[in-house]
Structure formats: C-alpha cells, structure tokens
Amino acid sequence: MEEKLNNKYSIIVNKKRRYNADDFKDFKYINITSTDGRNILIEEVTNIQFNKLKEEMKKQGINIGIKYALRNEQEQSDLYKKFCEKYGKEYADKIVCPVGTSEHHTGLAIDVEVMVDNKWIINNDNIEISEPILKVMHRYLIKYGFILRYPKQKENITQITYEPWHIRYVGTELANYLNQNNLVLDEYSY
C-alpha cells in the first residue's frame, strides 16, 4: 500500500525538508486570479480539484476562493516581513514559514478565503467569522483530494499554528489514508 500511495503529490516541504525545484519539474502550473485580483500560479490538477470543491461549497451556500497558492521566494520573504510588522516576530514564526520551507513554493498548497456579505474575509484578522465556515469546507476536503495541512491537534508535529484556511492537495487516496490513520503529511512522509 505504501508504494501505491507515494504519488507525486505526496512530496512534503517543511522546516526539515526544504523546497527543491527538481522535485516539481514534472508539474504543470497555470495562471489564475486570486481573491484580491492578483495573477497567481497554481498546479493544474490542484486547481481542477479546488474548482470541484468550490462547486460543492456553492451547493452549501458558501463561496470560497484562493487567496494564495504558489509563492516564490521573494513573495514568501515579503509576507514574512509583513507578518512581523503587523503581528510581531513571535507570531510570524508560528504562522509563516521561512523562505524555502513553505509548501506554497510547490503550488499544491492553498490559502482559502470565504466570502461574507459580498466581501472576502481576511483569515488572520477575522478568524472568528471565517473559521466556522471553513470547518464546513473541511468535511469535503478528502472527497477532492485535499487535507487540512495544519490541524489544531497536530501543531507539535507540523510546527505550524493551526490554520483552518490552509489546505494541501495530495490526491484522494492519500487524503483518505491520512484521515483514516489520523496522520498529518509530516508523519506519513518520514
């Protein structure tokens, strides 16, 4: 079963295993528009599956969109600096990965935003509004091959604070396996 589950989407990037562009050379990336109107890149299959998830959420009366997908090293550095200025270094270290250790370098990770009253809700500033809505989305992640990358009960393993908006595409089979065995990708990959 292990060999079957080790698909190309099982590659992990974190503080222990830095991003290596060679691992992702066979992936196809496409341009999309983020919730704040920026042109961003995302891995093609990840985007296809996210659009299916998005349609599922519309049936639930929930509008979701992509705030961030692929971030290059400069964008990651800029985001880290912004978080340090806005929230302080201690908080930034818990929620924004250093350059080279972010799954956003892969294009397989997505920061999801929800729309409330025709406005996209910024997760860090309005977690009390977005989290209950995102928890509805969590129930459908596996069906479309996604996992909640940084769950609350696994912070000591992921070394990242709980992020209800951060999902990661791994494929449906691996998503099911991780869920059934109560594992995060870090536990599976090592």
For each feature predicted by the language model, list its residue ranges.
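Extracytoplasmic cell-surface/polysaccharide-interacting catalytic and binding patches
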Residues: M1-Y190
